[in-house]
């Protein structure tokens, strides 16, 4: 059985042209037609994004199940990570990965019931800007009760790592979650208009085999967000 996964930092639907155009994000997600999307920087009731509940809006437009994990509260509204799934989401938890007084960060974990397969786990992370912060966050995530529980089923861990130098890959590889990008090179996703860094990554438990991995780069994705969406097709 093949399932497709996408991680995409949508930058609140605000493109590199500084315009809020959620219809561009909808167009991109619809054209990719993945089974599961892990989205970061998803606004809920924030003026800059027309007070939209973006996760609910995307869910309705795409006809998908969704769950939202809010991490950062603003004067009006909040934002965080969202998971959209073609299949029912049966459980979700938001893991707090905030280090000290740094910006609030989290990992949204969901169990998804896939027909003819059973449950899988999808964990959507958005890590910090400092190297020491990211290392602490990924170790805390791996050691969490939620992660220990969800790794009992086929698991995909994906999101915006902010890890330009691939320092987290050895830690995750040792934990049994190799990068789905086999050669660990190329496939840069940031900034979208001229990608120099591979910040957006997908890791999978050894239940999975990779059949395809790519960055979605076209005229629309170059402007819709400051990140490009990253896609993996996995076989189980």
Predicted features, each with a name:
Residues 1-36, 60-61, 65-68, 72-236:
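Active-site regions of metal-assisted phosphoester/phosphodiester hydrolases
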Residues 46-56:
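Short, flexible, glycine-rich and Lys/Arg-enriched loop motifs at helix boundaries
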């Amino acid at each position: 059985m093949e399932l497709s996964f996408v991680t995409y930092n949508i930058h609140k639907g605000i493109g590199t042209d500084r315009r809020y155009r959620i219809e561009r994000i909808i167009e991109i997600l619809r054209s990719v037609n993945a089974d599961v999307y892990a989205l970061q920087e998803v606004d809920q009731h924030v003026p800059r994004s027309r007070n939209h509940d973006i996760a609910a809006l995307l869910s309705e437009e795409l006809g998908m199940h969704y769950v939202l994990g809010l991490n950062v509260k603003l004067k009006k509204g909040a934002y965080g990570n969202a998971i959209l799934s073609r299949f029912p989401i049966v459980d979700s938890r938001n893991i707090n990965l905030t280090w000290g007084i740094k910006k609030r960060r989290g990992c949204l974990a969901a169990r998804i019931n896939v027909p003819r397969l059973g449950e899988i786990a999808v964990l959507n992370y958005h890590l910090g800007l400092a190297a020491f912060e990211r290392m602490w966050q990924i170790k805390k995530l791996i050691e969490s009760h939620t992660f220990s529980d969800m790794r009992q089923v086929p698991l995909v861990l994906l999101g915006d790592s902010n890890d330009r130098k691939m320092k987290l890959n050895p830690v995750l590889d040792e934990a049994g979650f190799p990068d789905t990008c086999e050669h660990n090179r190329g496939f840069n996703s940031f900034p979208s208009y001229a990608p120099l860094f591979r910040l957006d990554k997908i890791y999978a438990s050894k239940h999975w085999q990779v059949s395809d991995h790519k960055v979605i780069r076209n005229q629309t994705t170059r402007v819709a967000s400051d990140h490009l969406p990253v896609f993996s097709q996995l076989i189980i």
